[in-house]
């Protein structure tokens, strides 16, 4: 029997499985209070997915407000759309705008790695499409268990194939990212996908439904049983110790070729002025799209749910509403434009159906074969869910963790020991070449990729006539964030900011994806709140806004949470991509190598401590955001004036790793001469922040050095590029051939996963 609104009103005591749907007792009572009756089965399903942690941000919302509190009017000046929209949009000049966002698809990617990762890419691409933009590139932040753990092969293989298969089929270049291995991610990988889109400012579209009588059109793929309770339930629950799910919702199934057609269809609809408001269908499906569109508009909405094209027989209204079938969009269209809208969809062979209209009321009403199964105030579904002030407590173990310094570890001293250390780090899964993974992605499709391979940040040309471009980088360090969540988030921000700066671009905006354990753990909530405040304060110090983001909680197996992993993405703008700064050495004969910034004895949380002693303790490197701003300004000026021919930021593995990566990228040797009195181990392997390796043309050395001195930026000459050499030599200590470095680095991942 169909559970209608009328039936629900006359059967107040009918038992309902709200607990099985993830609702708490008090949440169920609140729904009854809102409606003045018990919810129908369909309403109950709708509230359960929309009030899930993934969709409602009920544990994080109270803390995320701090981003708004710390964003000044000056920081907002370039933002065309920010937090609360499908994706942030930034004015980059000359009438152009860029939209970008990063989101998680962690839990589905463990259950079914290929489809979980593929649909993660598809979902973030549709968020970008919904802003009126053409998607132009993707990036990914991946975290897996230990490289030698049995299940890591299954998960990594599926995730990498899923990302490559979907992104390559869409014709979107994958311009960068990061892959990290750590035992804490066994059973709970992180798959964070970022997409960048480009649009003219006048083409910006937002998610709202207004104008009584305007039609609601669902277009794209048919609606099936895949993904019901998928990301919205999976992302709001943990895995048990055996790695199996406590709940068994299905993972969504993606069709990249349908999405590719959908992109072109949307762009033609936008160009024709046929769209008033638009929303993609992601987590919670039509439940989310209809309630968000209605609550953001100036009226109500009616939906004839039985009009939705299905690909499975005998689906219930709740299943149709909550299905997370992919490649679907929902648009608000003026009645006079419906025929033209449908004609464009027919041209692209995209199925489109009028399923409802905007009303002048204040309710979201959904019917099924003429009977009302949903009658709710839409804001209570989409925006007025529960908000929790979870208990926050600094873990009792934090003091002991911070007291466990790496200074107690044995350090290499001799040239042979330093050489062995370099090869050990380079030959570990933590610092080895990622070519085995990245070669499965198309980095140069569409022909606008300027930097991707070997680069700190990816760069794209946006305007062929002027050369205007953008650079993007994403970074995170769970190890540093465990030691100090506030500083760890700022270090991730600083590195992403620096990675954009070393390309010659100017950082302008931030997005984030905050991956943490259970919010019901006060220690996790302490990590989360500290990371949010660190990131927000850091953005305020740098003067760049957070335009949006995502929170992923319940990333744990049993009671063991992942390392707190705030992923930070930074967008930069460059006036002309022809003045970009590459990573590889050897562009100019006899380049001088210089180290910018201060090097301190900072090894707590470092890759050296991890690889050589499996040690994690102490305090992370010092963060100096004023220095990061200064570095960015110097690099931008140097790029404009042609003073720098290559640059590479220093992070994991320190100076030694940066030198090796730049030498291999340029396929040229170099000779390093350490400053007199320097500790070779500290200078080569410290992970102090705020540092950059630059190659300066011989003719520009004095000019560049003078600019650094004038601005108060430490700059030390540490060697020269030797195009006649096939080795990296640290004078007086050791030398390693490029062939040995490359072989050591490139052999690691194929050994584990080939």
UniProtKB/Swiss-Prot annotation:
Its EC number is 6.3.5.3. GO terms for cellular component: cytoplasm. This is Phosphoribosylformylglycinamidine synthase subunit PurL. The active site is at residues 54, 105. The gene is purL. InterPro entries: PRibForGlyAmidine_synth_PurL (IPR010074), PurL_linker (IPR041609), PurM-like_C_dom (IPR010918), PurM-like_C_sf (IPR036676), PurM-like_N (IPR016188), PurM-like_N_sf (IPR036921). SUPFAM superfamilies: PurM C-terminal domain-like, PurM N-terminal domain-like. ATP binds at residues 57, 101, 512, 549. It is an enzyme of class 6 (ligase). Belongs to the FGAMS family. It comes from Mycobacterium bovis (strain ATCC BAA-935 / AF2122/97). It is found in: Cytoplasm. One of its GO terms (molecular function) is magnesium ion binding. Pathway: Purine metabolism; IMP biosynthesis via de novo pathway; 5-amino-1-(5-phospho-D-ribosyl)imidazole from N(2)-formyl-N(1)-(5-phospho-D-ribosyl)glycinamide: step 1/2. Mg(2+) 2 binds at residues 127, 280.
């Amino acid at each position: 029997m169909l559970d209608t609104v009328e039936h629900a009103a006359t059967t107040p005591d009918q038992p309902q499985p709200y607990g099985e749907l993830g609702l708490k007792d008090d949440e169920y009572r609140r729904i009854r209070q809102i409606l003045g009756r018990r919810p129908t089965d369909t309403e109950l399903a709708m509230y359960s997915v929309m009030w899930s942690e993934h969709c409602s941000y009920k544990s994080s919302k109270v803390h995320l407000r701090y981003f708004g509190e710390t964003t000044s009017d000056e920081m907002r000046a370039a933002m065309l759309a920010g937090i609360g929209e499908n994706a942030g949009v930034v004015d980059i000049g000359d009438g152009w705008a860029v939209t970008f966002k990063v989101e998680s698809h962690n839990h589905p990617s463990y259950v079914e790695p290929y489809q979980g990762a593929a649909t993660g890419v598809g979902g973030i691409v549709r968020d970008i499409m919904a802003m009126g933009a053409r998607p132009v590139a993707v990036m990914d932040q991946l975290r897996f268990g230990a490289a030698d753990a049995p299940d890591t092969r299954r998960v990594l293989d599926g995730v990498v194939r899923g990302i490559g298969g979907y992104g390559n089929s869409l014709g979107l270049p994958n311009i960068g990212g990061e892959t990290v291995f750590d035992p804490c991610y066994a059973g709970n990988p992180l798959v964070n996908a970022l997409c960048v889109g480009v649009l003219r400012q006048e083409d910006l579209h937002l998610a709202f439904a207004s104008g009584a009588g305007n039609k609601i059109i669902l277009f794209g793929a048919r609606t099936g049983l895949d993904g019901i309770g998928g990301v919205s339930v999976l992302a709001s629950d943990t895995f048990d110790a055996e790695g199996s799910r406590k709940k068994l919702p299905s993972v969504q199934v993606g069709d990249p070729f349908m999405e590719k057609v959908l992109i072109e269809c949307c762009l033609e609809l936008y160009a024709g002025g046929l769209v008033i408001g638009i929303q993609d269908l992601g987590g919670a499906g039509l439940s989310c799209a209809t309630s968000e569109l209605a609550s953001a508009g100036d009226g109500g909405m009616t939906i004839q749910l039985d009009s939705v094209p299905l690909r499975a027989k005998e689906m219930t209204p709740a299943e149709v509403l909550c299905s997370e079938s992919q490649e679907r969009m929902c648009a608000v269209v003026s009645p006079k434009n419906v025929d033209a809208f449908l004609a464009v969809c027919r041209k692209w062979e995209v199925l489109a159906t009028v399923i409802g209209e905007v009303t002048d009321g204040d309710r979201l009403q959904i019917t099924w074969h003429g009977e009302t199964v949903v009658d709710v105030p839409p804001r209570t579904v989409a925006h007025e869910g529960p908000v929790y002030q979870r208990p926050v407590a600094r873990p009792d173990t934090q003091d002991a963790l911070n007291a466990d310094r790496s200074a107690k570890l044995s350090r290499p001293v001799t040239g042979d020991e330093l050489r062995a250390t370099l090869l050990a780090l380079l030959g570990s899964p933590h610092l080895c070449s990622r070519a085995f993974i990245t070669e499965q992605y198309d980095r140069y499709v569409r022909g606008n990729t300027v930097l991707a391979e070997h680069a700190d940040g990816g760069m794209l040309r946006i305007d062929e006539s002027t050369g205007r471009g953008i650079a993007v980088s994403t970074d995170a360090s769970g190890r540093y964030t465990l030691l100090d969540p506030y500083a760890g988030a700022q270090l991730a921000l600083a590195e992403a900011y620096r990675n954009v700066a070393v390309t010659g671009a100017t950082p302008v905006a931030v997005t984030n994806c905050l991956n943490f354990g259970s919010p019901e753990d006060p220690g996790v909530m302490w990590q989360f709140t500290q990371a949010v405040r660190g990131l927000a304060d850091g953005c305020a110090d740098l003067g760049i806004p957070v335009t949006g983001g995502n929170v992923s909680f319940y990333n744990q197996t049993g009671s063991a949470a992942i390392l707190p992993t705030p992923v930070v993405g930074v967008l930069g703008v460059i006036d002309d991509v022809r003045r970009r700064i590459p990573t590889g050495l050897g562009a100019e004969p006899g380049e001088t190598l210089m180290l910018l910034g201060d090097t301190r004895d900072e090894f707590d949380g470092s890759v050296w401590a991890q690889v050589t002693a499996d040690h994690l303790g102490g305090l992370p490197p010092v963060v100096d955001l004023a220095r990061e701003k200064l570095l960015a300004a110097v690099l931008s000026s140097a790029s404009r004036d042609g003073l720098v021919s290559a640059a590479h930021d220093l992070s994991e593995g320190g100076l030694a790793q940066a030198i090796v990566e730049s030498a291999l990228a340029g396929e040229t040797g170099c000779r390093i001469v350490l400053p007199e009195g320097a500790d070779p181990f500290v200078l080569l392997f410290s992970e102090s922040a705020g540092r950059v390796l630059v190659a300066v043309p011989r003719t520009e050395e004095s000019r560049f050095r003078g600019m650094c001195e004038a601005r108060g930026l430490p700059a030390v000459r540490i060697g020269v590029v030797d195009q006649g050499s096939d080795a990296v030599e640290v004078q007086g200590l050791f030398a390693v051939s490029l062939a040995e470095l490359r072989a050591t680095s490139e052999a690691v991942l194929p050994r584990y996963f080939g």
